[in-house]
Amino acid sequence: MLPPALLRRSLLSYAWRGSGLRWKHASSLKVANEPILAFTQGSPERDALQKALNDLKDQTEAIPCVVGDEEVWTSDVRYQLSPFNHGHKVAKFCYADKALLNKAIEAAVLARKEWDLKPVADRAQIFLKAADMLSGPRRAEILAKTMVGQGKTVIQAEIDAAAELIDFFRFNAKFAVELEGEQPISVPPSTNHVVYRGLEGFVAAISPFNFTAIGGNLAGAPALMGNVVLWKPSDTAMLASYAVYRILREAGLPPNVIQFVPADGPTFGDTVTSSEHLCGINFTGSVPTFKHLWKQVAQNLDRFRTFPRLAGECGGKNFHFVHSSADVDSVVSGTLRSAFEYGGQKCSACSRLYVPQSLWPQIKGRLLEEHSRIKVGNPAEDFGTFFSAVIDAKAFARIKKWLEHARSSPSLSILAGGQCNESVGYFVEPCIIESKDPQEPIMKEEIFGPVLTVYVYPDEKYRETLQLVDSTTSYGLTGAVFAQDKTIVQEATRMLRNAAGNFYINDKSTGSVVGQQPFGGARASGERDIPGQPRLVQLWTEPPFTPLAVSPPLGDWRYSYMQ
């Protein structure tokens, strides 16, 4: 990380020189992806994590709303339960009501003026420091809270709450620094200079349970660009989300730039969309919720001081398409990881698999063999666990209902798994289903659980099957094609051009890396906000304006041809 003084000097600098303005472009801020630690037996990182997990045993952390730089404790108290041990209340938190949310909006609007004027170098420095804290002394804490609170295994927590969140903070800082260096052409003797300012008003950040990193990014990216944010974290990710918020504050984030406001969803949505100061919504969640927010914004357009910007990612019904030329080992390993890691609770998880008849006996045998080795359990006590419980009782009931549908449908056959048990935690066995009907609802609708449905197609009808892949569902987030035949890969890439925002070849549909594979979809999967690339920080700036365009003094107001 660059020291503050050096970081400032790396940015666009300018100074008065007589009657003109002199400036130069920014240098690039060097960052790299955070290494993923192994957590092998006896390693320092494993020992530190084990201690952090032990510290959380049977503990309930009290979490306030943070509004106006004050911890506010309301009477509307809620609890976050550990998914794999719902007898453990990991967090006690309170909801903000409409009055408190309006107070937060007022505090945000007041804080914006000073925050937006702060040099981007100073703002970036805060997020770089937070990244260093997450990479070092606070790593074990954020991993343990993500594991216990959201049911992640050590590797899934490491990928999410450490590596990806650190990458978001560092790469966004890089993108912000470099954006300042993008300047218009200056033709002597004139000099043009642009400033990238934050949006006028406040941004509402609404984050999901399944990635600690997403919460930090939804709130952090707009704040980095000079905006003020009301952050509504997920009830089922409260423990880790509050830890991220505290780390940002300890890294130097000023009061009221991000305010931490757990709230009832409809209350939060109604309040922010009725405020004249709303300038943006940064969202990850369900399609119905995002559509509702869009409608609320549309209905209130006449009251806003500016047109709000809406960015949203809404999940997917992601596919793996297998051609007869595919490598079976890659298909099996990639599909098991994509479908069942974190219990299928990733927006990018594979939930529909298309397999040619010629390979189905081999792939089926391998899938069932490897499926029998998957261990589902308590990831805090057994690091051999591949995935844990689903997030809460609501998710458990939804997935169980789909499995009951699979048992009763004549076109569906359960090949493995699918047992459910909520006596201790919300456990669902990874389930593999074969469908005779490619248009069966289970092939169309997002389940968000450890359920993989397979459709076996005649080898010679691969083109028709590619059309099915493209047209079956309303989503368009991620997908993968497995084929060794380059001609088939090219053809599939053309035919599935609009079927996925992140399209993989001979690799699983999950696992995008910040700065390498910017993540986002289209269709019902969202507005394509594209975290992980420069466009994200640009989204949260006003169109640049020219504060100084220095030219020779204008003489006669008339043009020469008029004389």
Swiss-Prot record:
The modification N6-succinyllysine is found at K30, K92, K98, K113, K129, K174, K346, K394, K508. The record marks N210 as: Transition state stabilizer. It comes from Rattus norvegicus. GO terms for cellular component: mitochondrial matrix. This is Delta-1-pyrroline-5-carboxylate dehydrogenase, mitochondrial. NAD(+) binds at S207, K232, G285, S286, V287, P288, T289, E446. InterPro entries: Ald_DH/histidinol_DH, Ald_DH_C, Ald_DH_CS_CYS, Ald_DH_CS_GLU, Ald_DH_N, Aldehyde_DH_dom, P5CDH/ALDH4A1. The modification Phosphoserine is found at S43. The lineage of its organism: Eukaryota, Metazoa, Chordata, Craniata, Vertebrata.
